[in-house]
Amino acid sequence: MTELDVVVQEIAEEIAARSDRGSVAHYIPELAKVDPAGFGLVVIDADGHVAAGGDADTAFSIQSISKVFTLTLALGKIGDRLWQRVGREPSGSPFNSIVQLEFERGIPRNPFINAGAIAVTDVILSGHQPREALGEILRFMRFLTGDPTIAIDQAVAASEQRTGFRNAALANYMKSFGVLDNPVDYTLGVYFHHCAIAMSCRQLALAGRYLAHSGRNPSTGHSVVSPGRARRINAVMLTCGHYDGSGEFAYRVGLPGKSGVGGGVLAIAPGKASIAAWSPGLDASGNSHLGRVALEALSKRMGWSIFGV
């Protein structure tokens, strides 16, 4: 076993012994059914070595982690023109807040809060039918992982559509300012479905490898984005990837990351590793509580914080 294998196993054992697991996302009925005892951790280093602990192959709803990949696709489609429709600043507000949109003329603060991700989804949808846009997103996820089995959890998507009134309000408000080009129902349908993609920690860590290695998958040699674009996506992940808990994550973990209310976290150690953690219990900001604890321990023990050891 490598040092990384040992560290990952130790962390998985430590997390299993803890009782402070946070609370699952009750406002999405399907997510409220998830057992809060689950935990997985997978790290894939630059050589392609996989260190796995806990429920590494248990699929979960990636939720807002999908926003990293839709951001990548939207930037590929219209480039830096995207930043005319969505900002790059932390919000300091809950992920589904409508308050800032009123003051900022319908322009969302960043692509990782719900309003921003809906605007990004609208870019991907333009020129397509909703089914085609979803197909593009799924093909991208399957390309990144080399796994054709990745799919949308239709029960979760339907659950979100039935209860996503706040997201509908955000979308309609942006539409009133001309930020969205497509019918609101179409954009929301694609948004709810890509948030309902189900992946395991192993699959998610595979998907994030291009961000850890200057836009390129080192195992396949495939270039996904330019080095500069990978760096900028990582920068937005660091400053905005955990809603109004982004500063706390940067302080404790010191890595770019993106959380989802399904309990997953994708973290990037630039030049070193792509990391996925999952624990469905959330903290007050809607981020995985023990996922953050595990990543803090990993970053500290491996000396991976971008701010130094």
Curated annotation (Swiss-Prot):
Q: Which Gene3D superfamilies did the record assign?
A: DD-peptidase/beta-lactamase superfamily
What keywords does the record list, in alphabetical order?
A: Hydrolase
* The protein's name in its UniProt record: Glutaminase
| Principal EC category | hydrolase
What reaction does this catalyse? L-glutamine + H2O = L-glutamate + NH4(+)
- What PANTHER family does the record point to? GLUTAMINASE (PTHR12544:SF29)
- Enumerate the residues binding substrate: 64, 114, 160, 167, 191, 243, 261
GO BP annotation list: glutamate biosynthetic process; glutamine catabolic process
Subunit structure and binding partners:
Homotetramer.
Q: Which domain of life is it from?
A: Bacteria
Please give the start and end residues of each transmembrane region. none
Gene symbol of the encoding locus: glsA
E.C. number(s) listed in UniProt: 3.5.1.2
Whether Hydrolase counts among this entry's keywords is: yes
GO molecular function per UniProt: glutaminase activity
Provide an example Pfam family for this protein.
Glutaminase
Family assignment from sequence similarity = Belongs to the glutaminase family.
